[in-house]
Design a protein with these regions (language model features):
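Mid-to-C-terminal alpha-helical segments outside catalytic/metal-binding sites
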Residues: 6, 11, 27-38, 47-77, ...
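Active-site gating/metal-coordination segments in enzymes
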Residues: 30, 84-169, 217, 224-225
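Acidic/histidine-rich helix-loop elements
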Residues: 40-55, 110-119, 228
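Acidic (Asp/Glu)-rich catalytic clusters
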Residues: 60-65, 85-98, 126-136, 164, ...
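Catalytic pocket-lining loop regions of alpha/beta-barrel enzymes
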Residues: 149-250, 297
Length: 298
């Protein structure tokens, strides 16, 4: 069954490639609907106790101007997310809903060590119990695994099971091999694959994983090979999205301060290729898929 679905995606990609030059020449208008930013960091260097270079009012105004109506906020440390969640007047004025995730990183050292540190699991439990001013945490992550074998470790296993037991979404920056290992710990978990494989997993492999794991979704920031001429989707990716319109999300990945001045252009880039999709598919990827993850909050 999975093989058949992958073959169908391949045939659709071939048909789209034939008409690619015509499609680029007749681009549709940019998508104008709401956006859900499913991968946003508000790290310490951005806000720095509200006196940093990008205070809450600044970043929320960037979201408002970009038509972003909801965000998955996850930050190093979690104080950044709680700062945004606590800015209730400003988020209301900007029309932005903050969906808070628990990040595993208290500091930069945790990026490379969280999967061998039992105190991380306790920290996640404590944060979950406390919640935020915007309500309970709705997910865990983003976390990184640069060696997929670490996805099979005890800390990763406990976190995946904790997420599934508490209906939390997981945001993971991992390769395709780690997707299999993480899902083996908790087959019912909802997992967002950050960047849909930043290492550039082939489209065929992405299609296989989507077919294998119905609760897996792909987030598309930094995804190699996603767009081609005119900022439109490359044929294979367009085919995959048309075949799986409910499985993709967009994100800014503001992992470094240099991403904040680019925020509006990043969202404009998404609007460009979303505009080349059928209207219902564009709205699902741009907004509805993210909102559905967190209903009835949105």
């Amino acid at each position: 069954m999975i093989v058949d679905r992958v073959r169908r995606v391949g045939r659709l990609a071939a048909l789209l490639a034939v008409s690619w030059s015509v499609a680029v020449a007749a681009q549709a208008a940019d998508y104008a609907g709401p956006l859900f930013d499913a991968h946003l960091h508000y790290n310490e260097e951005a806000w720095d106790g509200r006196s940093g270079p990008y205070p809450p009012a600044d970043v929320l105004s960037r979201m408002r101007r970009s038509g972003v109506r909801a965000i998955i906020a996850n930050s190093r440390p979690n104080d950044g997310t709680k700062t945004l969640a606590g800015a209730t007047r400003q988020t209301a004025e900007a029309g932005v809903t903050v969906v808070p995730f628990i990040r595993l990183y208290r500091n930069r050292a945790d990026y490379d060590n969280w999967f061998r540190d039992d105190t991380i699991y306790k920290m996640v439990q404590d944060e979950f119990a406390r919640g935020t001013a915007a309500g309970p945490y709705r997910g865990i992550g983003e976390f990184h695994l640069y060696d997929s074998r670490n996805a099979d470790g005890p800390v990763a296993a406990r976190l995946m099971k904790f997420a599934a037991a508490n209906d939390l979404v997981v945001l993971a920056h991992v390769d395709d091999a780690a997707i299999d290992l993480l899902m083996a710990h908790a087959p019912q978990a909802r997992l967002i694959w950050a960047h849909t494989g930043i290492g550039g997993a082939p489209v065929e492999r992405v299609a296989q994983l989507l077919a294998r794991y119905p609760r897996l979704m792909g987030e598309l920031s930094y995804r190699p090979g996603l767009t081609c001429d005119g900022g439109q989707l490359c044929p294979a990716w367009r085919a995959l999205m048309l075949a799986n319109p409910g499985r993709f999300l967009i994100g800014s990945d503001t992992w470094t301060n240099s991403r904040w001045p680019q925020y509006e252009s990043l969202m404009s880039g998404y609007r460009r290729w979303l505009g080349g999709l059928p209207a219902d598919v564009a709205r699902r990827i741009g907004w509805e898929n993210g909102a559905a993850l967190h209903a009835p909050r949105l």
